[in-house]
Amino acid sequence: MKRTFQPSNLKRKRTHGFRARMKTLSGRKVIRNRRAKGRAKLAA
């Protein structure tokens, strides 16, 4: 059976990367919340 997680760095960056997050309002909220929490990594 094929597993659901088929890693691809390109897909990873395009969907969860910093620039992808900055494109949408909700994505910017994610970055803002992660900054407020003090995360070392803001995006993938």
Swiss-Prot record:
Entry's transmembrane regions: none
InterPro entries, sorted: Ribosomal_bL34, Ribosomal_bL34_CS
One GO term (biological process): translation
Keywords: Ribonucleoprotein, Ribosomal protein
Keyword Cell cycle carried by entry: no
Gene3D superfamilies in UniProt: 1.10.287.3980
Pfam families attached to this UniProt entry: Ribosomal_L34
UniProt family annotation: Belongs to the bacterial ribosomal protein bL34 family.
The name this protein goes by in its record: Large ribosomal subunit protein bL34
Gene: rpmH
